[in-house]
Amino acid sequence: MEMRNTTPDFILLGLFNHTRAHQVLFMMVLSIVLTSLFGNSLMILLIHWDHRLHTPMYFLLSQLSLMDMMLVSTTVPKMAADYLTGSKAISRAGCGVQIFFLPTLGGGECFLLAAMAYDRYAAVCHPLRYPTLMSWQLCLRMTMSCWLLGAADGLLQAVVTLSFPYCGAHEIDHFFCETPVLVRLACADTSVFENAMYICCVLMLLVPFSLILSSYGLILAAVLHMRSTEARKKAFATCSSHVAVVGLFYGAAIFTYMRPKSHRSTNHDKVVSAFYTMFTPLLNPLIYSVKNSEVKGALKRWLGTCVNIKHQQNEAHRSR
């Protein structure tokens, strides 16, 4: 009789090997990840430090930065530690943690981007009613809903995925535990779960995406009816950053989770997963800081404050 689950750990084959080219690539990825963590941390700091950014729009942006930081922290530290130490094992509990947080953060970000699109719709199409249409109470409810819906999906995936038997097939050809990759190793019929997961992914991607498209369709119609060129420019400026982030996130997510099995390959999965877990979190703060004058203004004021504090400390030190 075949023994099941005799090995408690899984083996992550990783993203890199120890060739010279991959060592350079690893250092580049590590630099990108550290820059991503710094950029998102700075975005959160600026939003909470500058009272001019204490609006629902920037609160939602701070939640996006928090999700991106957590997404990077869920996968990269383990990948880097495995590469540096040569140990590729990950426990079932560790695998479960990654399986839980990835859908939690990815799914939460789907809904959060829809909430941000509604915020822009209210600001552009109904500026006089914006405080009512996007009250702080509604903003907090929407934020909590994004986290809870993502967490419900993550918990379901983690529990069901780890409940399958793995009869000695413990090598995961990936750099983190991801449900679609892991269920391929199960020595049980996973077709029902895979179909249910596919439907769930389609709903979690397409429902928010449809809301985003509807919001921007209404925004575009409102902008085209604006007589003032300056008002049009301001409306496009306030929405362009969000549109760019939506395009990056949904492009990678749809390519990853909505492709037929016949078009899947391990190498493609790794590349796309690296894009949305490492590169997208880097690009988000860059997009918002480059395109948003209010964020750039907050950064200048914060740097000015830091310089003044340093100058005062030096003056106090000299006077002693």
Swiss-Prot record:
Record field: transmembrane: 24-47, 56-77, 99-118, 138-156, 194-217, 235-257, 271-290
GO terms assigned for molecular function: G protein-coupled receptor activity; olfactory receptor activity
GO biological process: detection of chemical stimulus involved in sensory perception of smell
Localization per record: Cell membrane
UniProt key word Cell wall biogenesis/degradation: no
Leader peptide range in chain numbering: none
Gene3D superfamilies: Rhodopsin 7-helix transmembrane proteins
Keywords tagged on the record: Cell membrane, Disulfide bond, G-protein coupled receptor, Glycoprotein, Membrane, Olfaction, Receptor, Sensory transduction, Transducer, Transmembrane, Transmembrane helix
Record carries keyword Transmembrane: yes
Task of the protein: Odorant receptor.
Family: Belongs to the G-protein coupled receptor 1 family.
Protein name (record): Olfactory receptor 2T33
Source organism: Homo sapiens
